[in-house]
Amino acid sequence: MNTIDKIFNYNRQPNISPFFKEKLVELISFGTYHNDIEKIRDGIVQELVNYREKYKITNVVIGMSGGLDSALTASLYKTAGYHVIGVTLPIHQNPDETARGVEAINALGLDHKHIDLSNQYDFVVADTISNFGDTSIGNDDRATAMRRGNIRARLRMITLYNLAGKYKGFVASTDNFSELAAGFWTLHGDVGDVAPIQSLTKSWEVPAMAELQGVPSSTIQAVPTDGLGIANGDEDQFGFSYLEFDIALFTLIKNLSLANATESDLKIIDSVKSRVRNSGYKRSNPYNLLHPMFPARFGELEILDEQL
């Protein structure tokens, strides 16, 4: 199976438009879709080993959603010699998602904790209505669904950080590069302390590395969801696939020609532009203002960090 066929297979997508296929071929030739996944994996694992040795922290807590990203993240920490605690945290969740999380935990040989947060979530939503009079929190529109999704993400992160404190460890981030660019995460929610796969593309490097790491095929082939109840899946929110998102993103990053793009192709390109532009504030959070008199203070503190 050649690289393009592998990419289509990982993305459950038999084909893409001629323009997007043309750009994919260009990106493969540039090395953006690099074949040496093992070398990339080894580099990430070494960085995780370096972090463990520098800070003397061996325990890591990971929310196991049943998705590919959390399973790959857990496997990389395991390979790097960490004690990994995988936590399933359903909130009115599809049982299949939780079952996949448990399957990945067992396949990777992780410790498992299970905490159903559905009652806590219901209490927060009900309390928001009763104490603040915010009846709109129950609306069915997309914006309100995102607010409720953010409550889910932040409840999970409170729980994960509490466990990390118990085990004197830290919380892993599980977001990938595509999610980073799209703004597909909750500030102070489904993020953590160390992000091993945040530089990896969802359409290629994440599934290819997961296969290399022995992540169950049922997880690799599962439709990507955020577990926040916002839509039927990540790609449902996009209106197109992660593969098309990644190709469009790198077409913009590398300033490739749009000469052969159809109107439908350009709609995807414009949608990606909009998502990246509108989520920039999240990638710069917290936005630290420089001291008006002593603008070098942050840099001086970074130097001290390195010295110590």
Kindly label every feature range from the protein language model.
Residues 72, 98, 124, 181-184:
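Short glycine-/acidic-enriched loop or helix-start segments at secondary-structure transitions
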